[in-house]
Amino acid sequence: GDAELTPEAVKLLDSVADAIYQYNDNYITIEGHTDSNPISTAKYPDNMMLSVHRAHSVYNYLVNNKGFDAKTMTSSGRGENVPIADNTTAEGRAQNRRVEIKIYNNLNSDIQ
């Protein structure tokens, strides 16, 4: 497992960024996910750390390359805790290795 953006991921992220840039002033969260296979490397001691790095790679790309406002974005890792597919198959594990970008409506700041 790795958190580096591949050329294919950058191409997809460019398309996504162009589509969601109009929501740049909304609150945006970026969540990294992994499959359930244990990982233990010097760079990523566990799946949680790998998922954090995956999300932060996307966050950094959007801020540094696409002009997104860092003040309205957060990144976090969920590890293997929120699967969307069966981790017992290669296809399911591949689906679980992902980054999700969520956009939230701005709340009325006058309410205290």
Locations of regions flagged by a protein language model:
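Periplasmic OmpA-like peptidoglycan-binding domain that tethers envelope proteins to the cell wall
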Residues: 2-23, 33-112
